[in-house]
Amino acid sequence: MVKRSQRVEKKAVEVNRGTWTAEEDEKLMNYVSAHGDKKWRMLPAKAGLKRCGKSCRLRWLNYLRPGIKRGNISEDEEDLIIRLHNLLGNRWSIIAGRIPGRTDNEIKNHWNTHLSKRSLTIEDLNKKHNPGIDNIDILPPTKITLTSSSDTFPVTPVCQTDQASDTNKNDVLVDSWTDLSGPDFDLEQFLSLLPMSDLCPGSNGNELEFDDFGIPRHDSKQDSFRSNDYNINYQECLDSQVWSCAFEYDDLDQFLDCQS
């Protein structure tokens, strides 16, 4: 029995290699515009091109598709490539997506040809764009010495109107003490005229105490007693009859009615 080996002879398809011609570019652009950029393996035969599908795809994506920039890469684009490469590394497709109009293949070729030999970092780029920062001289603080008596700090003068108001307030306070036995005596008005230091605890921790009639109690141990501030003697302000009758009544109103 004779065996016959059947050999299927595949006809080799002739494929052009090398630089693309203007005629080939036009054929590829016309076909992609009409049918889209899909099925690159079948595209060359349908478009009448003697190229492989990979060559057609790269030619379209890197050179012929709309939005591609022509010409050399600018200095600003180089700085952006360096910054992105320091952050992302050799991820050329991601870097190309952040630089409009440039392809990943173009950026990779430009990096390997021109930028890989430069050891530039982000700090070097910041100094390049802001050269005036390093030229700023920071002076140390200097001490100011007073050489004469005139070199003194200004002192805020005391307002004369404040002194006059304090004097008038003291006069009204003394008059209130002398009119304690009168019918028009107002205890709340009298207390409002006292300084806050008289109503609050003093520096020695003692408090101002009042008796049943609203009269401050005298404490001989307190050197800063309030009567010394105004030179007031309580027993001299009240006559002996009023002073003796003051302790016979439990109510302040009864005491004032008795004197009227």
Swiss-Prot record:
CDD domains: SANT. SUPFAM superfamilies: Homeodomain-like. Its main location: nucleus. Residues 40-64, 92-115 bind DNA. InterPro entries: Homeodomain-like_sf, Myb_dom, Myb_TF_plants, SANT/Myb. The keyword DNA repair does not apply. It is found in: Nucleus. Pfam families: Myb_DNA-binding (PF00249). One of its GO terms (cellular component) is nucleus. Keywords: Activator, DNA-binding, Nucleus, Repeat, Transcription, Transcription regulation. It comes from the Eukaryota. GO terms for molecular function: DNA binding. Residues 12-64, 65-119 form the HTH myb-type domain. Transcription activator involved in the spatiotemporal regulation of flavonoid biosynthesis specifically in the corms of Montbretia. Activates the promoters of enzymes involved in the biosynthesis of the flavonol myricetin and the flavonol-glycoside montbretin A (MbA). MbA is a potent inhibitor of human pancreatic alpha-amylase and is being developed as drug candidate to treat type-2 diabetes. This is Transcription factor MYB4.
